[in-house]
């Protein structure tokens, strides 16, 4: 993207290449992602493996945070009930912009095995916008790492100055 300005006095034209600035800022953003864990069921066990030395997500710049006010994205893993949906929405609202969500596992994506239960939300995307879906029951840490890479690609491709758009949802 190029912006053009013209000096009224001399008539000189100055070109600014803002795409290079976008690339630089997005490179910094994509390689320093801090995440908030919202593990609800079986997928919470795989989240422990995701943060362990074998998966080594810190090489991608992903660091767990205890507070939503410090997190760039949230990983929702497991069966989301209507009662917990209020808490998930509250945590999402407390995160600073730009914020992203990874839905991990069949239960988070669509309700999974428990989708016919009266208290089960039929997917996290009914409550908060989801950017990346990671399928599986439960998904392996490698699948979640692939989801993290997809999130980095999403961040790399969007202009940094835009406001948050509704999530499109990409499958990992």
Curated annotation (Swiss-Prot):
Chief subcellular location equals membrane
Q: Which family does it belong to?
A: Belongs to the complex I 20 kDa subunit family.
Gene name of this polypeptide: nuoB1
* Binding residue positions for [4Fe-4S] cluster: 42-43, 107, 137
List keywords of the entry alphabetically. Answer: 4Fe-4S, Cell inner membrane, Cell membrane, Iron, Iron-sulfur, Membrane, Metal-binding, NAD, Quinone, Translocase, Transport, Ubiquinone
Topology of this chain in the membrane: Peripheral membrane protein
The superkingdom listed in its UniProt entry is: Bacteria
Pfam families listed in its UniProt record:
Oxidored_q6
Which residues, if any, are the signal sequence?
A: none
PANTHER family noted in UniProt: NADH DEHYDROGENASE (PTHR11995), NADH DEHYDROGENASE [UBIQUINONE] IRON-SULFUR PROTEIN 7, MITOCHONDRIAL (PTHR11995:SF14)
Question: What protein name applies here?
Answer: NADH-quinone oxidoreductase subunit B 1
| Quaternary assembly | NDH-1 is composed of 14 different subunits. Subunits NuoB, C, D, E, F, and G constitute the peripheral sector of the complex.
- What biological-process GO terms show up in the record? aerobic respiration; electron transport coupled proton transport
